[in-house]
Structures are given as C-alpha cells and as structure tokens.
Swiss-Prot record:
Zn(2+) 1 binds at H74, D107, E171. This is Succinyl-diaminopimelate desuccinylase. It is an enzyme of class 3 (hydrolase). It comes from Methylobacterium nodulans (strain LMG 21967 / CNCM I-2342 / ORS 2060). PROSITE patterns: ARGE_DAPE_CPG2_1.
Length: 396
C-alpha cells in the first residue's frame, strides 16, 4: 500500500495555515491539493452576502454511485488572543509531551486531518471502485457569521444535483475522553431583547415619571416563573437565561426612560422559533396587562432543534468507536449549535471528533494518541459503510 500522510502531519499542516475566520489562510488549498491527488474532483466556490466578508469553501467528491457518505467540517478558527500567553506559536503545530499545540488542533483541524488520513488510506487500499461515493464539504465560515459557508455550500451542491445519504461532522464532541459522546442532534437557540418603556423623571418626583425597572422585573419573573418544558427522550429541558440587563442611566437621581434585558433560550425539539416566540408573548402579555408597556424583539435564527434518530448508521459509528476505545459513546444533544443544523436538511448527520476540553482556549492542543485512534475509528466506519450493511443501502 502506498505511503499516506499521518494524521499528525496533516494536523500540523492545517494548524500552520493561519485561517482565522474568514481568512482561508492556505488551509483549503492544502486539502484541495491532497484530495485532488487522490482522485477527488475539487471545487472552491466563493459565496457573498451584503455586510459580510466573502468566504471561500471547498467541495470534493470521488465516485458517482450510491451510497454517498458526506464528511464535513470547517477550517476557519477563532483568533488566538494574546500570543504571549501561548506556550508555543498558535500557528506552529509544535509537538510537546504527546500533544500537538495550535489554534484549531481540536476545533476542528485535527478532526478534518483524521478524516482525510482515514480516507487516503482507505483509497490507497481499496482503489476508486469501492462501491459508493465520498464527498468532502469544508467551509471557512463556521466560527464567523455562518452565512457564506455550509448553508450556501449545501444549496450550491443541491443545485448541481449532488445527493448524500449520511454525514459525519468531525466536531470535537467528547467532553473528557475519546469515545465519550456522539452528537445525534442539537438544541435550537433563540435570542431576544425585552424592553419596558417608562417616562424619565427626577427621583424626587416619581409621580411625574414612570419607572420601567419594576415592570422589567415583573416581566422577567413571568418568563422564569415556570419551566418551558420537562425535556424529551433525547433532549434536556429548554432553558432561558438572561444575559444582559441595562437602563442606560449613569445618574443616580434620574428615573430612566426604559429598561432593557436580553435573554437566550436553548430549546429542544418540542419547540420551533415561532411557537417559542408565541409562548414568550403569551407569558409577557399575561404579566403586563395594562400596567406595563413593553416591546419584544426576537432575533432571526436558523438554529433550530433537530434529532437524528438512532438507526443502523448511528449503530455503525457507535460500533467503530467502541471497537477502538472500549467505550460505548453516549448519544447526546447537549452543547451549542454547529453546522449540523444545516446539514440535517440534506441527510441524517451525526457529529464525532476529538476531545473538546481546550477548544477556543489558550494552548489549544490534541493528544497524538487521540489523532491515531480517531483516524482508526473513521477507517472502521469507511470499511463498514462500503459496501455497508444492507439496511443502510435502502436510501441509496
């Protein structure tokens, strides 16, 4: 079998590309060269949106037959922050004490490197006629606004007639150890601003003013008085958290004209953004009556709750993880949002990658042993998926 690059070498190569969102930084070029040499057709569409930076993306595919396994991720990273606080250059890919250091080592250049290493080894052994197709969908706009990335790349692929049967998104899903957790869904996210309107005045003459602060407290209490729900089989209860409260008033002898609070709700699959907003307004109207004047501004959101039902594909990935780590992963929907919220409209999607303890932190790093094990897990998935269990092939 020809030599194929190691997951460490690929991780280091990607880390050394300074792809702070939305910069491409050479990361997509590295992958394009690698995949092109392995026989993939590679395209690099650039998407635009007024008020946001143009973003370059990558789509690569090998094979035309079904089933098609989609492998997804992002090469953009968050800024490194204070460079002096890092033990090593955040774009150096330095190895120390069994770990590779650098921005994106965990989130998620290491995961992409493991996918690529597994696929290259798979193709080197099996050749291009492996009984299906493999597609790579990589964006440079996940850590940023996420408007010129995966969502548009999927629409672009759909217009080209591309179809996918299942997807693995290599996000760092494991809390503590490799093999802890597969994400089979994500909670939705809704942010809103609640403003209570009053009348500004002197504190010594409250009868000439209308203090909005008691009204804000009253309405906030109404939102928090009862749980939104009790959770579902695969989701925790929906949760509302106030994140800012402000009256815009530096003077201690002035009653403010308005009081404003912002809150975020992470919600489960019992709700949609529309039904959740309706429930919020019902509670607020009941509490406000004719005594409190308020406005509620809900931010548009594309982060809806979704669930990939456990099925033979989830079982296949679970078995591969258990075979390599000895751990049976939990099937979870916890955590924040990811690009899986877009992919779920194209095909069933699960997320599995490295241990996420240091993602977005100073001295972000990944264990070399985990890179090897994750690559072995992905290789097991490929071997089982092609030709795969007959139950999986029904969608092809």
């Amino acid at each position: 079998m020809p030599n194929t690059p190691s997951p460490l070498a690929l991780t280091q190569g990607l880390i050394r590309c300074p792809s702070v969102t939305p910069a491409e930084g050479g990361a997509l070029s590295l992958l394009a060269d690698l995949l092109g040499a392995a026989g993939f057709s590679v395209e690099r569409p650039v998407f635009s949106e007024p008020g946001t930076p143009d973003v370059e993306n990558l789509y690569a595919r090998i094979g035309t037959a079904g089933p098609c396994l989609l492998l997804a991720g992002h090469t953009d990273v968050v800024p490194p922050g204070d460079l002096a606080a890092w033990r090593h250059d955040p774009f150096g890919g330095v190895v120390e004490e069994g770990e590779v250091h650098g921005r994106g080592a965990v989130d998620m250049k290491g995961g992409i490197a493991c996918l690529a290493a597994a696929i290259l080894a798979f193709l080197a052994e099996r050749g291009p006629d492996f009984g299906g197709s493999i597609a790579f969908l990589i964006t440079g706009d996940e850590e940023g606004p996420a408007v010129n990335g995966t969502v548009k790349l999927l629409a672009w692929a759909r217009q080209k007639g591309e179809r996918f049967d299942h997807c693995i998104l290599a996000e760092p899903t494991n809390p503590d150890r490799l093999g802890d957790m597969i994400k089979i869904g994500r909670r939705g996210s809704l942010t809103a601003a609640l403003t209570v309107h009053g009348v500004q005045g002197h504190v010594a003459y409250p009868h000439r003013a209308e203090n909005p602060i008691p009204g804000l407290i009253r309405l906030a209490g109404a939102l928090l008085a009862a749980p939104l729900d009790a959770g579902t089989a695969h989701f925790d209860a929906s949760n509302l958290e106030f994140t800012t409260v402000d009256v815009g008033n530096p003077a201690s002898n002035v009653i403010p004209a308005e009081a404003r609070a912002v809150f975020n709700i992470r919600f489960n699959d019992l709700w949609t953004p529309a039904t959740l907003e309706a429930e919020l307004r019902r509670r607020l109207d009941a509490a406000a009556g004719n005594a409190v004047r308020y406005t509620l501004a809900v931010q548009p959101t594309n982060a809806v709750a979704f669930l990939t039902q456990p099925d033979p594909f989830v079982d296949l990935v679970t078995a591969a993880i258990e075979a390599e780590t000895g751990r049976r992963p939990a099937l979870s929907t916890t955590g924040g949002t990811s690009d899986a919220r877009f992919i779920k409209d194209a095909c069933p999607v699960i997320e599995f990658g490295l241990v996420g303890q240091t993602m977005h932190q100073i001295d972000e790093r990944a264990a070399l042993a985990d890179l090897d094990r994750l690559t072995a897990i992905f290789r097991r998935v490929l071997d089982a998926y092609f030709p795969g269990d007959a139950a999986l092939q029904k969608r092809a």
